[in-house]
């Protein structure tokens, strides 16, 4: 299980991505950041809103305890995601790459089960528009 201050935590039971508060991160590379911003601009009309806090570990824990509904980012390091992704899964989240495959630092999506597939499809579609 996952705990916060000795209390069991669970991710939100959200099932509608139009109500999802989604968190992401942006690259330090200006070119990559431009592509990421274009992706987010394509997604913003289909979700409630976007947030950025700047630390994958915190973002993942915020999804785990229900402060956020989803988190996605790319080009992370294993140490950026290892603990937070485990906590999120223990809190009931699903995790994978943007297409729903296995977790990998190159692409990470974490969300409650009810929005994982629709959010994965949205991220994939918004990303393919950049190619």
Model-predicted regions and their roles:
Residues 1-60, 107-131:
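Acidic beta-strand-loop-alpha-helix segment within the catalytic core
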Residues 2, 84, 91-93:
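Small-residue (primarily alanine) positions within well-ordered alpha-helices
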Residues 26, 74-76, 98-100:
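Short secondary-structure boundary segments
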Residues 48, 73-79:
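Glycine-rich "substrate-gating" loop/helix at the edge of Rossmann-like oxidoreductase active sites
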Residues 56-57, 77-81, 101-106:
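Small/polar glycine-rich anion-binding or flexible loop at a beta-alpha turn
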Residues 61-64, 85-90:
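Hydrophobic residues within well-ordered alpha-helices
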Residues 65-70, 92-93:
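Alpha-to-beta junction loops
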Residues 92-108, 112:
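Acidic, metal-binding active-site segment of PIN/NYN-like and related structure-specific nucleases
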């Amino acid at each position: 299980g996952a705990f916060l201050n000795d209390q069991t935590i669970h991710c939100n039971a959200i099932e509608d991505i139009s109500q999802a508060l989604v968190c992401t991160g942006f690259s330090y590379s200006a070119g990559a950041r431009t592509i990421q911003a274009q992706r987010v601009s394509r997604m913003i009309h289909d979700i409630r809103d976007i947030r950025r806090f700047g630390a994958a570990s915190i973002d993942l824990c915020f999804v785990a305890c229900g402060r956020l509904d989803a988190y996605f980012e790319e080009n992370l390091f294993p140490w950026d995601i290892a603990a937070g992704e485990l906590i999120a899964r223990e809190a009931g989240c699903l995790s994978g790459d943007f297409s729903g495959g296995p977790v990998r630092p190159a692409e990470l999506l974490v969300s409650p089960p009810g929005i994982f597939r629709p959010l994965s499809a949205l991220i994939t579609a918004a990303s393919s528009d950049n190619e």
